[in-house]
């Protein structure tokens, strides 16, 4: 007997033109709201929905009636901002180079620090970030994985802000460094917009993004491994400087919000439905 993996069939409509491809690598967009501002270890409480809320700058300081400061932007003074960073691959750990996860100095992959962490107040807690890339994928089946402390959500969609993007992997909660493995099926070769939301409440913090080939774990975009999945940042995206709004885009129109939100409770039957589409 044999077991057929439970593949997510990725929509071929997500493929973007080759003209969107920038340099090799990922964009790491890290945010932090720690106990030094709020008195709480984290505001997102290790939940996907709240991590998205933090990343969007939607947690409000009740005294100033403005968003809390992003401690992972060293140029921040007040309010919400971002400081996206280019990385070649994703093998990060708050205690680098101490070994955590599958890839470490023990097997030739010394852990790297999480960009801009510790933040303003020297904390390593209350983090929510995203890792963005265009993955070059051929037709066929792929096994992907994320090793994380704490949780994550991986998606493929027409654009990075696409709320209708396909979820291909998720761990919605807190945990120590652990693997989540998931399978996808590609029916059309091309560049696919890939996003991993990652978050950490307190204690340890790490993330690795990889594929699995014949039982071997391979970092996505490892230039030293033949056949490693290649990743590229979208052309024109800002890196290594402060921005007030995230600008990584594929140029494709996407649904960026739906009101009422999925799962929202106590919605009046007469309430209107609002869908916002942005290019």
Go through the PLM ranges and name each one.
Residues 2-7, 248-279:
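N-terminal non-catalytic regions of secreted/periplasmic and cell-surface proteins
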Residues 5-250:
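Acidic/polar, compositionally biased interaction segments
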């Amino acid at each position: 007997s044999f077991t057929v993996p439970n593949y997510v069939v990725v929509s071929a409509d997500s493929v973007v033109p080759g003209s969107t491809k920038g340099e090799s690598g990922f964009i790491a967009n890290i945010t932090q709201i720690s106990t030094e501002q709020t008195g709480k270890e984290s505001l997102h409480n290790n939940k996907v929905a709240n991590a998205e809320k933090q990343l969007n700058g939607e947690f409000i300081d009740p005294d100033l009636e403005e968003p809390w400061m992003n401690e992972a932007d060293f140029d921040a003074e007040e309010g919400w901002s971002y400081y996206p960073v280019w990385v070649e691959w994703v093998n990060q750990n708050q205690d680098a180079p101490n070994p955590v996860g599958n890839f470490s100095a023990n097997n030739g992959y010394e852990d790297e620090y999480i960009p801009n962490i510790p933040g303003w107040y020297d904390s390593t807690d209350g983090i929510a970030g995203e890792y963005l890339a265009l993955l070059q994928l051929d037709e066929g089946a792929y096994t992907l994985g994320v090793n994380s402390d704490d949780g994550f959500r991986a998606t493929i969609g027409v654009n990075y802000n696409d709320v209708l993007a396909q979820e291909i992997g998720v761990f919605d909660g807190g945990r120590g460094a652990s693997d989540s493995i998931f399978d996808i099926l590609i029916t059309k070769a091309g560049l696919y917009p890939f996003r991993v939301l990652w978050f950490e409440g307190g204690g340890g913090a790490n993330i690795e993004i990889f594929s699995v080939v014949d039982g071997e774990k391979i970092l996505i975009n490892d230039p030293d491994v033949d056949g490693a999945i290649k990743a590229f940042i979208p052309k024109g995206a800002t890196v290594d400087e402060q921005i007030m709004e995230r600008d990584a885009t594929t140029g494709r129109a996407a649904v960026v919000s739906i009101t009422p939100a999925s799962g929202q409770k106590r919605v009046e039957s007469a309430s209107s439905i609002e869908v916002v589409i942005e290019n």
